[in-house]
Amino acid sequence: NDSYWEGSDPNIQEYPVFKVDSSTYCILYIKFFTDKLFHSMIFDMASILSKKQQIKGTPGQVYVQLKQMIGQRFTEKYLFYLIMKGILTDKRYQIWTGEQLKQSYGDGMPDMIAIKAQRVFVFEFKDVQLSAKVKESGDFDTIISKINLELVQTEKGKPKGVTQIANVIEKRLEKLLPSNEKFKIYPVLVYTESSFDLEGINYYLNNKFREILSSRNIDDNFCIKDLVLVNLETLFMFDRAFRDHKLKFDVLINDFLSYKTNKIEHGSVPFNKFLFQRGKAKGYFYKSSGIVRET
């Protein structure tokens, strides 16, 4: 019905469900639907806490505080490691969590390091969100500026994301690795913001990463691979394939890096899409997670 949208500006991210009739609803996009459920629940909690003054601030300010608390206490400290445990199933991996690394080597370490033979995976996890205002701006400079602030460095010069990984490779990895051996270093940035799934984001951040590395003093024994962005939700979706040894993380990353260089048009393809294709080919699309069965 053309008149339905007359005078309106429909936004399926804000309204991901379409009412067909009094008893039938159509989910327009499942990711927007689940995001809406999750964030609406947090905002409802924020509104109640703000109204009762259990947390000071407007509902919007309390919402930001709650999101930070959930990220710090649950997503970063528990969920990230739980999912990665199911992904890195090969017993040959030597794995250190961020807490273990900090206790043994002090500040400045990544959220996880996994070593398998001469392959070293450096994981940095970022539970950040781009605001609707930024995502809907349609302005390249606005979006890139926010990505830089969240995943490169803050306005005050504090390292974030790719810069943190570069710092680890230059200054901290030598503490874990023998000095007389050669290693392949795989920088991996794990995220939760679905907008980072889009073509070109990984390409842009890898260029920033390479630019940062070019001014650093990197150990000659380190062969630094391209940066790979990985969506935590997608790993969760296909974790059963990893647990069943149908997918192997290190092999998948190497295959993806080779795929990117095969053709020029592959250069901007995100790892998320590559993993979807491999997971579906193995028959694991939308199969229940091993984490769900365990918990």
What feature does the model see in each segment?
Residues 77, 159-170, 206-215:
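Well-ordered, non-membrane alpha-helical segments in soluble/globular domains
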Residues 114-132:
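Active-site beta-strand-loop-beta-strand hairpin of nuclease catalytic cores
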Residues 185-192:
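Extended hydrophobic secondary-structure segments that form protein cores and membrane-embedded regions
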